A protein has these predicted regions:
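Local sequence-structure signature of Cys/Sec-based thiol-disulfide redox active-site neighborhoods
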Residues: 2-28
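A short alpha-helix capping/helix-coil boundary motif
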Residues: 6, 54-55, 89-93, 120-122, ...
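Conserved short-loop catalytic and cofactor-binding motifs
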Residues: 14, 63, 99, 126-129
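Short beta->alpha junction loops/turns
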Residues: 15, 83, 131-134
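Structural alpha/beta surface segment adjacent to cysteine/selenocysteine redox centers
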Residues: 20-111, 184-188, 192, 196-205
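C-terminal cap of thioredoxin/glutaredoxin-like
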Residues: 25-31, 101, 105-205
Length: 205
């Protein structure tokens, strides 16, 4: 397992605390494993999942900055134009702003503050933030995830062989041994398709 290289797609939404826990854990694993774990972060807006009307399409909304989900995706997409490391830093910063700071990721000043904190070129970021280029990416990620892979929530981790799992990592008590946990997670999810669902009972609920 230690010598394996894995590439995974991770479906996420910034509003989801479980996706935040997954991001922190996977970053810890990547920090130790380096190129042996490659992660493609895929947009999966929960606002679209929970839409009341069948006609609602998040990616068809106007590019006017009024939707927080789209705005957060525009922000991280703008960061990615400044490099993979810039994306990585901004991705983590947006989760922190949302879940530790309680900030609204639809507010331009919040996004610009995050961009400044992670060292982005602010003028370039401001220009790229206004692009609607990411809208089609959101559509493609969501549609493929839902229709082709059966993704229903975040975070969902999908391996190259198409096997995947929706995983709730306790963001208040992350694994103390992130790589060991990863090495235990992989063979069950990737290599055991007969394991259809694992769900812990919740005493008192």
């Amino acid at each position: 397992m230690a010598d394996e290289t894995n590439t995974i797609d991770v479906y996420f939404d910034y509003t989801c605390p479980w996706a935040w826990g997954g991001q922190v854990w996977l970053y810890q694993v990547q920090d130790e494993l380096g190129d042996k774990l490659r992660v493609n972060w895929r947009f999966f807006p929960l606002e679209q999942v929970n839409a009341k009307g069948a006609d609602f399409k998040l990616w068809e909304l106007p590019n006017d900055g009024s939707n927080a989900s789209l705005r957060s995706y525009q922000a991280v997409h703008a960061a990615k134009k400044q490099g993979d490391d810039a994306f990585r830093r901004m991705h983590a910063a947006l989760f922190l702003k949302r879940h530790e700071g309680g900030r609204n990721l639809g507010q331009k000043q919040v996004l610009e503050a995050a961009a400044t904190e992670v060292g982005l070129d602010l003028d370039t970021f401001r220009k790229d933030l206004e692009s609607d280029e990411v809208f089609s990416v959101v559509k493609d990620d969501f549609t493929h995830g839902k229709k082709e892979l059966g993704v229903f929530g975040t975070p969902t981790i999908v391996f190259e062989n198409g096997q995947g799992a929706y995983l709730k990592v306790n963001f208040r008590d992350l694994p103390k041994d992130p790589v060991k946990f990863w090495n235990e997670f992989v063979p069950v999810v990737r290599d055991r398709p007969e394991a259809i669902e694992i769900k812990r009972p919740q005493p008192g609920r």
